[in-house]
Amino acid sequence: MNKDTAKSYTALISSMLIFGTLGIFRRYIPLSSAMLALFRGLLGSAFLLILVFVKGGKLQKLKSRTVFLLAVTGALMGFNWMLLFEAYNYTSVAVATMCYYMQPTIVILLSPFVFREKLTFKKLICAVAAIIGMVFVSGILNGNGIKTRDIKGILFGLGAAALYSAVVILNKKVVVKDVYEKSIIQLAAAAIILIPYLLLTEDITKTSLNGTAVCMVLLVGIVHTGIAYALYFGIMKNLKAQSIAVMSYIDPVFALLLSAVILHEGLTVYGAIGAILIIGSAFVSEIARN
């Protein structure tokens, strides 16, 4: 392994570890999910824009159709984050993370209709395994019933997964050479679309944060979004798609570990089996696709 490849792997792993801590940070930020999503998009896009100019780059003029599609995917990202943050609020980080990682399964099931791709036997088995895993993770089989809060959290998590699936599908229709420019537009759109939503649903004048919360928000916007996106997209040309797909599963595994160690939200035996089925099926389907 040469030095450049080693640096790329280090950047990729670092970005996955950063993404894996997002649920923990969300627990300590006393903002509504919509407000946090807005700040994430705003700070993340600002950071990447500054990074592009510092590196001597400039934004290219894009076709109006491309900008429109990027704005739509960005808007979907904004509401996707909002639902994911709500999932973290209502259920454990572990369960919310597993719900969110149903996204590859949703894409697999939609692929025959959207991309005219054949649903192979391997992909079908992966989808069925993930759905069974979701049943295990949900707590239905624990015998104690599911709390209303957990049901809401699961639904928010699955909703976030569905929106992210839409982002993945639409992204395939958008061709932009500069991944930073693509991310800047999407992150900015995510923030902009949430402004009218917040004005209609919240009294933002009553929002107040202490010093710790402000630092947490800055970390989510700059580190979890700006820096993590820069690390992730900065290595895409240097590593094989399959390598990136494999390493991307550091994120949910690390999130599960942190949930257990820091928040003491360990999965039940059924939950652990479900997590293995969901992550395993997503992993196999990604490897097959790449």
Residue ranges and their predicted role:
Residues 31-79, 104-107, 163-167, 184-202, ...:
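Transmembrane alpha-helices of multi-pass small-molecule transport proteins
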Residues 1-14, 46-72, 118-124, 142-152, ...:
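Membrane-interface interhelical linkers
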Residues 35-38, 42-46, 85-118, 160, ...:
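Specific alpha-helical transmembrane segments that line the substrate/conduction pathway
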